[in-house]
Each structure stands twice: as structure tokens, then as C-alpha cells.
Amino acid sequence: MTVLEAQRKSLNLAALRDPSRPVSRIADDLLPYLQVLVDEFAPRQVILFGSYAYGNPDEHSDVDLLIVKDIIQSAYEDAVAIRMRWAPLMKRGRLFSFDLLIEPPEEHEARLRGGAFYREINERGVSLA
């Protein structure tokens, strides 16, 4: 087993399909996107936050994801790479609007210590991977 394989996360399907959480309503449609994210981009952690995690989503709600991963180029370029890889899924599956926050582990730890927004994500969000 390589180091990358050892670090690779698997999806938390129980959390994704938990009927007490709003995300369960879109779980089957969201799963292909999350599988690509986990399999191809090796995040250390993926946390769903916002209305699909702990709110009251409607047809205009986006899917908010905090992705903790080693940054390959920049957070922006990594987000573009993820979205480009998701493009074929959007053509044949359900179209989602995603809000991606991507940060390296060190930055994430610092933000948890210093910001209420990130603490709320960590405490109330749904850990998907």
C-alpha cells in the first residue's frame, strides 16, 4: 500500500444517507460527485456545511463543501480541477451548484482556533470523508 492509498479517505455513506439530515434527500445524486472527489483528489477531510447539513434547503440551495487537502497548485486551481472533473457528471446527472472551500490541513487547524465560522462547520457539519 502506498502512502497516498493509506491517506485516502472513504466516503461516510451512513452520514450521507442519515434521514435526520437534509442531505439524505440528495444523497444518491450527490454520491457520484463525492466519489470522484475522494478517489481522484485525495482529500484528508470533506465536510458538508450550510443548509444541506443543518438547515432547510430549497431548490436554490447550493452544496457547501469544506475540503481539507494538500494543495497541489493553489486552492483556486484545485477547485477548478475538481469542477472540470465533475463537468461530465453534470451533463448526465443532477446539476448542483457547489460552493467549495479548499484549504491545506495546517491552515484549517489555524482557522479552527481563530474563527467561529470554521468552528461551526467543524461542530455542526456532516463529515462525508
Language-model features: locations:
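Catalytic core of pol beta-like nucleotidyltransferases
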Residues: 1-45, 54-59, 69-129
